[in-house]
Amino acid sequence: KNFLINIVRYLPVSACYIISMTCSYFGVRFIEESISDPIENTSGAVVPILCAIFLHQTMSAWAIVVVVIIVIGILGVGFVENTGKTDLKKKLGKKLAIWAFAMPFCYALLDACGTFLDIFYVDDASSTFLVGVTEDTIEHMANCCYEFTFFFISIGILIFFKIKGVKLFSVADPTNEEAIAHEATLTWYQKVYLQKDKLLAALFETMGQATYIFALSEGEGIAAVILGAGTVIISVILSRVILKEKLSWKQYIFIFIILGGIIALSLLGL
């Protein structure tokens, strides 16, 4: 009973995280992961600003300088991404280019709002909105509420697709009749296996979320450095090695400016 109540009470936080991820998945279809991921991880720079505005907390002079550096990096990436050979407007059209490039920023803002709201839910078990939790269980309860909310939404979307007659787990080219005919002979678990890359991605995402909660609740300050900077570094490396993304030297300069700002902001929290 308490768990269902907590799912409802934690819904504002879950909504911020889930909608932010939806924005991320939409944007990554059109923008290189090497660019979108550093922008998305600047959500850590937005949280102190929200705390300063709504909780009247003060930011140190160094924190303000770092936030300004991150903003400069973001503006630089935005300028380079929309000029010269990397002009998104030429590749996608003006309207879609605006929507695509806005998605990483939407993710950063919504993720920051989710993190900000988490302060009211997991900071103190005696004053939390969640019921039936202790200092030892509050983070785990919050994580379970988020994961099950995501699960229930996925079930709802699955039912909606079935009603609309959308072909689930289809990988066949809709213009290739032979491929469509072959796919029709496959069993449901064979079709699911064809989506193994997405299943693996979902597994990593879920494990990452659990690790994120544990690291912040149980780890030392260095965890913030690893989480804030490590994800960006690994993402840029994997995008270059596996996805074969090639960026201009100007883009890399501004990306490393953002990365440096994220590392500095994490270190300030030590």
Predicted ranges, named:
Residues 23-39, 126-130, 137-140, 210-230:
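Structural motif at transmembrane-helix junctions in multi-pass transporters
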Residues 110-152:
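Juxtamembrane helix-loop-helix junctions in multi-pass membrane proteins
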Residues 1-23, 40, 98-108, 169-211:
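Loop-to-transmembrane-helix transition segments
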Residues 41-45, 67-70, 74, 150-153, ...:
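Residue-level recognition of pore/gate-forming positions within transmembrane alpha-helices
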Residues 14, 18-22, 45-49, 108, ...:
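Hydrophobic/small/kink-forming positions within alpha-helical transmembrane segments
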Residues 24, 45-65, 214, 232-252:
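C-terminal transmembrane-helix exit sites in multi-pass transporters
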Residues 50-52, 61-82, 250-269:
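Hydrophobic transmembrane alpha-helices of multi-pass small-molecule transport proteins
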Residues 1-19, 69, 139-180, 234:
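Transmembrane alpha-helices of multi-pass small-molecule transport proteins
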